């Protein structure tokens, strides 16, 4: 998945909010981690403020 596509999908999850969407965001970040590494995940968390919205912190590892 491209980072642009990941950003697009994460914005949808942010707009809907809720616990299920937090889990979806974690799955998207796991895919980003597998393809682009932890730095890309941390950048998305910072850029989209996922720490405030879903309590997802920089440095967290996402795997599936």
Each language-model region and where it sits:
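N-terminal acidic leader/helix
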Residues: 1-30, 62
């Amino acid at each position: 998945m491209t980072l642009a596509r990941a950003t697009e999908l994460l914005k949808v999850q942010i707009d809907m909010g809720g616990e299920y969407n937090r889990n979806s965001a974690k799955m998207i970040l796991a895919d980003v981690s597998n393809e682009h590494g932890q730095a890309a995940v941390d950048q998305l968390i910072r850029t989209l403020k996922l720490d405030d919205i879903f309590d997802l912190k920089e440095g967290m590892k996402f795997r599936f």
